[in-house]
Amino acid sequence: MHKSALGAALLTAALAMPASAQEVLTAVHAFPASLIYTQSFLEFVEKVNERGEGVVQIEVRGGPEAIGMFQQVDAVRSGVVDMAYQPGSFYAGAFPERDALVASNLTAVEARANGGIDLINEIHQEKMGLWYLGWFDSGVTYNLWTVNEPEFDADGNLSVDGIRLRGNSVYNAFFTDYLGAQVIDLP
């Protein structure tokens, strides 16, 4: 988990503000507080609030119980909150390039070093009018398990054509449209 890059960006921006007033940023997160991804974000908020005392603080207004997970980006765009922590897949209609993030095997540190974060930020600004600061828990991969030995095509790529996969709304289009798998949603 590479949170230091995002923390450094926020703290650098905060330090550039006038010293006379503490800036308070409001934030929401897409998932319940008990989920590991949200816990990473909340740990980040704690560190910013500790290190930014007197300069910048982040006030978390809640998760999907406060603002629906699919409405959070619009809440940032309209100024209801200042930040949202959520997967790019949740605003796929406005940002189809998010598939590069979903399929990436790079960490956030590597993406920042090679200019990837800057490019993603430019696209966010152009298409959505928002600044993209980075992502948490980078390097987390998606794993597929199967009872039967998988098949590979002539190029050595995994063939999942016709295989039934448990899915969810975040990955279903990728599984069906790109991989050709059959998706079954389970609670």
Give the location of each predicted region.
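Bacterial N-terminal signal peptides that target proteins for export
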Residues: 1-7
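Cleavable N-terminal signal peptides
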Residues: 8-9, 19
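Sec/Tat signal peptide C-region and signal peptidase I cleavage site
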Residues: 15-21
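Alpha-to-beta junction loops
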Residues: 53-56, 72-86, 180-182
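Short helix-initiation/N-cap motifs at beta->coil->alpha
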Residues: 61-74, 168-170, 181-187
